[in-house]
Amino acid sequence: MKSTLIIFFTLCLSMAVMARHESYYGNTKPAKLNEEKVTRVRFYLHDTLSGQNPTAVRIAHANLTGGSASPVGFGSLFVIDDPLTVGPEKHSKEIGNGQGMYVSGCKDLSKFTIVMYADLAFTAGKFNGSSISIFSRNPVAEEVGEREIAIVGGRGKFRMARGFVKVKTNKIDMKTGDAVLRYDATVYHY
């Protein structure tokens, strides 16, 4: 009888422990966040499609747009590893890189728009090891003033970031698609 009780309690305890560990979530607790901060950062993104060492490469292209005169024809998907610099000059101090993808999302070049996801990572200076993530529609043809793209996250010093980036085309070569863009980021973070 004694051994039967021991086995019974062992089985009950095992089942209770197993039931506890089958849950895929933990307890929900109220979050205590630090005070929210706002940081403004200006840098330049160099997007190069041409030459021996491009930083943006087409990885997919729809057959129906094969005859497009644009270097970034409708339906083209690009992967990027663009340098971020302090100034607009090609040899300006590099402070990071933007890695991600963009797709040409507009048939009409006069309304040229890309949809992009990128992680803008800082590799030097005060924000070394931190990044901001953008995921947004970028209406490139709307050059009156500045375009605005959304900041949807971040890491490091920009953990839980949100905000926006004002984008202004500093220089563009319409034949090659090469561009230098000024990014003025307003980042809300904790």
Curated annotation (Swiss-Prot):
Leader sequence segment:
1-19
Give the UniProt keywords, A-Z.
Apoplast, Glycoprotein, Secreted, Signal
**What InterPro entries does the database record attribute to this sequence?**
Allene_oxi_cyc_Dirigent (IPR044859), Dirigent (IPR004265)
User: Which Pfam families has this protein been placed in?
Assistant: Dirigent
Provide the residues annotated with a glycan attachment (glycosylation). Answer: N63, N128
User: Per the record, GO CC terms?
Assistant: apoplast
**What GO terms in the biological process aspect are recorded for it?**
phenylpropanoid biosynthetic process
Q: Domain of life here?
A: Eukaryota
Q: Where in the cell is it found?
A: Secreted, Extracellular space, Apoplast
Q: How does it assemble?
A: Homodimer.
Q: What is this protein's function per UniProt?
A: Dirigent proteins impart stereoselectivity on the phenoxy radical-coupling reaction, yielding optically active lignans from two molecules of coniferyl alcohol in the biosynthesis of lignans, flavonolignans, and alkaloids and thus plays a central role in plant secondary metabolism.
Q: Of which family is this protein a member?
A: Belongs to the plant dirigent protein family.
Write the protein's name: Dirigent protein 15
List the source organism: Arabidopsis thaliana
